[in-house]
Amino acid sequence: YVRLTGFVDTTDREFDAAIEQMRRRHDLNGLIVDLRFNPGGLLNQAVSIANRFIPGRGPIVQTADAQGRIASQERASERRASVTDIPVIILVNEGSASASEIVAGAVQAYAQQGAIDAIVLGQRSFGKGSVQNVYYLPGQQAAMRLTTHYYLLPNGRRVHRLPGATDWGVEPDLTVEMLPSQIQEAANLRRNADVLPINERGEIVDTGEPRPDPNDLLSNGLDLQLQYALVLLQSRSEAPALGQVPRAPMEPVTIEN
């Protein structure tokens, strides 16, 4: 399990380190990538992360103008496809936007072609996929931000939600809804588990007080989407029977950005 909270300069390197650690310490036979409430970030990092799951040299994302003319394209590189040998589940929700939608949508597009073993689970993403440029007005006292292009996924789907649109973002292969109270409780547990007490020198200290346990998301039924994802992975790899949801099989990794 890897949770990405954003896309910054070091995201792909931290992701690679997390995967390497999992392969070294465990028999890694499936991966959950959590992009829920990920607001996005750097496009090149989204392309780099998506490339980890996509073999070959196919397109990952394109930009198109209002008339649908392709202006630019980012393609996969075979040498960067490092996680193509295991089933993958990507979690998204209405808080997944921009770069996270590009990752989820690109992986989904190739999975639907049968090129990779992956599904997207959760709720429809936010729908933010526009390219904007800033133009300064005469005198440099004011500026105008103008949308010039939109992002397109490999299957031609437009990410951005336009006024009155009924189709946008990334639609999960498997929709699993959660109540607002469940979302809040799960988010609070994750946030509190990620906070580490430090002393005045910036060193992590043990206060002796019990810390929130991320495994409670599963064992206490707080995160239905994560629970479904784990059951699906277990069903694909000689794991416990469906319906039996054990504690997380390995330490989760959060890449904070």
What kind of feature is each model-predicted range?
Residues 1-257:
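C-terminal "post-core" interaction segments
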